[in-house]
Amino acid sequence: MAQSQLAKGSRQTTGRPFQNKPARAARRLVIRAADAKEIVFDQESRRRLQAGINKVADAVGVTLGPRGRNVVLEQKFGVPQVINDGVSIRRAIELKDPVENAGAQLIKEVAGRTNDAAGDGTTTASVLAREMIHYGLQSVTAGANPIAVKRGLDKTAEYLVAKLKEHAKPVKGRDDIKNVASISAGNDNAIGEMIADALDKVGSNGVLSIETSNSTETVVEVQEGMEIDRGYISPQFVTNQERLLVEYDNCRVLVTDQKIDAIRDIIPILEQVTRLNAPLLIIAEDVSGEALATLVVNKLRGVLNVCAIKAPGFGERRKSLLQDIAIVTGAEFIAKDLGMKVEQAVVEQLGVARKVTVANNTTTLIADAASKDEIEMRIAQLKKELAETDSVYDTEKLSERIAKLSGGVAVIKVGAATEAELEDRKLRIEDAKNATFAAVEEGIVPGGGAALLHLSELVPAFKETLTDAEEKLGADIVMKSLRAPCRLIADNAGVEGEVIVQRLLGKPFEVGYNAMIDKVENLLDAGVIDPAKVTRNGLLNSVSIAGIMLTTQAVMVEKHKPSEIPGGMTASGMPSGMTI
């Protein structure tokens, strides 16, 4: 392929248009510049934002709990999708009113932050945020100082997070893992068993990957591979926009400890890989400047499927980790100490990964079957080094490397009879996987909204430590809001939620409402449990967004224009320029 066929990145500059500053005579006005804006102030802005927030929370709220309902999503092509996953529902929501849509985006941000941090709990976080915003706006409308109320929210949340950590129990054995996974997957015991089986095979520090099966059966396979604690350098490399992932099959892998910043460093190897029509993963000390721009441009233009990540670790440990990666993928480590240069690299020096998945902070490599013997030899070498070292630090790091190499990757191959069932099942397994790792990390608490409800009972005592009356309002808002998830779970199960809440108040922390069997019981003993990390992140993110809403005084959005279609016609079918 000629060098000219690879597009070179270039710097672009953008000018900022001058705007005349409008007089703020009215409380609602339109600024006309390159694009007209609508600005809405005070109560109207908060009312319309809240309307958008309520629509999202109502849509995802119906799925909460073991007896939560389904939601039908219209697809651009094919049959509608029937799902019970809050993440997918919130992603699909776009509202016609631009201010309401801004509110919808705010509560979607709560869910997104919670999902990014803990991998689950998006529906609970959305419900919590809606309640805090509802009660908070009531207080502000009645004349409370929003800054003081926000301080009360923040202080109460900080206190409750500390109490939550005190009540969290460590995960003990297979049963706890199975229960966490089952609950997160919508009380699907088969998925719970599957996640427990997978972790039995690779350990709690292992890696789980989810793929589509070629049959209708769902199976767990353990394959050679490893996870790297580094993500993509640029989000422009993303191939799966919904999940913000880079996903490639049969990917070539370049492994080096050198910095790549000049075009000349990478053009030769890019041309060779382009001829193979194969994707490329670059693992280097850094990729920046013209080199990064060139990769991004060629990825966006469809010339080459490529992704770049920074090498994990530091100093000598970085070299060792890169050697591990090279062995897993069958690559030759292009080391600067040996006088090797990236610009002289050839295809034969690249490794191969059967599957590569890159997130914003992790990369999973599933190795080609041919690498198995080399990986076993590397593990044996590391075990020998481990036996000979006296350093506590070296012992820890060598053990970590051995675990990464020997654990492998548990691949859950998901099968189903229909496309709709397949997508729903994959979403449930993804939730179960994320919840399980969150539980292993920070422990478990009673589920069913019970942990949040019992935390609300601790607020009155904490409120007595506050001296500002409006900060106490913030504490009251948190207290009332924390009871909403339990109430909604009961409502979705067909019973009176407020009655259940009153029955649980004053009970021990472990006692809650098991909606699956309509019974108040010890939820830890019953296996109805949630990861403490999910509960913590849901609470903190809800308080954060509620504080933003309470201190919002104006909203500026794009003013909608009639969309035009070819032939000078508007979307309504009338000729453009006509008054309708």
UniProtKB/Swiss-Prot annotation:
Record's compositionally biased regions (Polar residues): 1-17
GO cellular component terms, semicolon-separated: chloroplast
Keyword DNA-binding tagged: no
Superkingdom of origin organism: Eukaryota
Transmembrane spans: none
Alphabetical list of InterPro entries matching this protein: Chaperonin_Cpn60_CS, Cpn60/GroEL, Cpn60/GroEL/TCP-1, GroEL-like_apical_dom_sf, GROEL-like_equatorial_sf, TCP-1-like_intermed_sf
Subcellular location: Plastid, Chloroplast
UniProt GO molecular function: ATP binding; ATP-dependent protein folding chaperone
SUPFAM superfamilies with a match to the protein in the record: GroEL apical domain-like, GroEL equatorial domain-like, GroEL-intermediate domain like
Induction or repression: By heat shock.
Region listing for Disordered, in residue ranges: 1-24
Function of the protein: This protein binds RuBisCO small and large subunits and is implicated in the assembly of the enzyme oligomer.
UniProt similarity note: Belongs to the chaperonin (HSP60) family.
Note: This protein shows ATPase activity.
HAMAP family linked to this entry: CH60 (MF_00600)
Subunit annotation: Oligomer of probably six alpha and six beta subunits.
Protein name: RuBisCO large subunit-binding protein subunit alpha, chloroplastic
Organism name: Chlamydomonas reinhardtii (Chlamydomonas smithii)
